[in-house]
Amino acid sequence: MLELGKLLTALIAPPLNTFVLLIIAAIIYCVHFKKLAKFIAIISFTWLYIMSAPFTGLLLTNNDDSPALTLDEYKQAQAIVILGGGSYQTKELYAETASGAPQLERLRYAAFLQKETGLPILTTGYSLIGISEGDLMAKELNQFFNVPTQWIENKARNTEENASFTKNILIKDHIQKIILVTNQWHMKRAKYLFEKQGFDVLPAAAASYGSKGNLSAKSFIPDLGALNSNMVLLKEWIGYWKAHYVE
């Protein structure tokens, strides 16, 4: 079911949906429905352009409407929860597996918050390669930031499981009010799913994907960076709608 959901999401966004639509258009063209084939091809390239243009990021980026919080407010929490954000295998000397950019951004912010608040940390996340994200984050927090980890959750495969499995751990210590650390583009969905589990969530959003600022001529010129960030943002909106309205 998890893999089916990922496939359906991939079919909505380029480049897979562009490829699929062009194959469909070619088949239809061969059976002499040429106008319909041309229409499908136009739709395919239009959607590819929209998803590749920076202006789309302006529309999708502002998906976290949580207010900015102060350190005094964060100090009212009982624990800090860091969500896994991806890892990769490396030839760097310090480890065989390392945190990817989004996960490292989360670790950096969480380390700062822990040193300012003194709160215990829980890391959560599974991985298909090598060490789990939960274990890897705990290791890197200690190795690079000299910050300890109180709890490690290493089975969660998605944000919904992050929330559910975290509850199973923290409920034993009667912890309900948490600082939730993830990237800005992921926060809206993550916050909703953790609140659904009964947590009182103080959002702590790390660095963000997407375009910021005002529209300019450059905003309408497609580029690969915009395609990548727009796909991430679209995936998050789809995930939020699915969690909020379907489940």
UniProtKB/Swiss-Prot annotation:
<keyword id="KW-1003">Cell membrane</keyword>
<dbReference type="GO" id="GO:0005886">
    <property type="term" value="C:plasma membrane"/>
</dbReference>
<dbReference type="InterPro" id="IPR003848">
    <property type="entry name" value="DUF218"/>
</dbReference>
<keyword id="KW-0812">Transmembrane</keyword>
<keyword id="KW-0472">Membrane</keyword>
<protein>
    <recommendedName>
        <fullName>Uncharacterized protein HI_1701</fullName>
    </recommendedName>
</protein>
<feature type="transmembrane region" description="Helical">
    <location>
        <begin position="11"/>
        <end position="31"/>
    </location>
</feature>
<dbReference type="Pfam" id="PF02698">
    <property type="entry name" value="DUF218"/>
</dbReference>
<dbReference type="InterPro" id="IPR014729">
    <property type="entry name" value="Rossmann-like_a/b/a_fold"/>
</dbReference>
<feature type="transmembrane region" description="Helical">
    <location>
        <begin position="39"/>
        <end position="59"/>
    </location>
</feature>
<dbReference type="GO" id="GO:0000270">
    <property type="term" value="P:peptidoglycan metabolic process"/>
</dbReference>
<dbReference type="GO" id="GO:0043164">
    <property type="term" value="P:Gram-negative-bacterium-type cell wall biogenesis"/>
</dbReference>
<dbReference type="InterPro" id="IPR051599">
    <property type="entry name" value="Cell_Envelope_Assoc"/>
</dbReference>
<keyword id="KW-1133">Transmembrane helix</keyword>
